[in-house]
Amino acid sequence: RVHENDLPSVEPQHNAAQRGAAWQWHEEFGDEAAIGTVAHAWLEHIGKEGLEQWPAQRIDASVAIMKTQLGRAGVSRAELDTAADAVRLTLVATLASSRGQWLLRVAGAYREWSLLDATGRVSVIDLAISEEKGWLVVDYKTGVPWPDDTPDTFAARMRERHGAQIQRYCSQVSALDGRPARGALYFPRADIWVEC
């Protein structure tokens, strides 16, 4: 059984405020940022512990912990069930996908990697994989296509929305050793891979 102390913590909003800088989610995305933060913490943990240790039943048994983490991240009580289900579905879908399994299994991957650029900006990269020809930088996303989306329209919208962010990540990783970096967005719930 999973215990809350075994997992990465998600800092409550009031702790950031006590340090003098309140952490605010972008309202336009609702609870999406909190869901993403909690899902990323779980994916990092599963990747480090090994996906064989995480059957779907263990994830299902961890929903109460997810709700606690989401609540601490600012999700309202009224939205906790929906938000926790989004995290659960993201994790289960990642484990069910061959691409998701590969991303969790890849040896020597840097997970939730904090990098500082020349301007002092910190970026937390979900996953960076050193390959023979350079780097692969992957940003997990918890969203799903709209009902009327085609794969191409969804990919184009996501490139528009997240492209600058993933390119910044690639630049930061490439600056470490001069090797090229390519970026991708991975949407486990829809099993969609978007090259950026």
Region locations from a protein language model:
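Structural signature of nuclease core domains in nucleic-acid processing machines
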Residues: 1-196
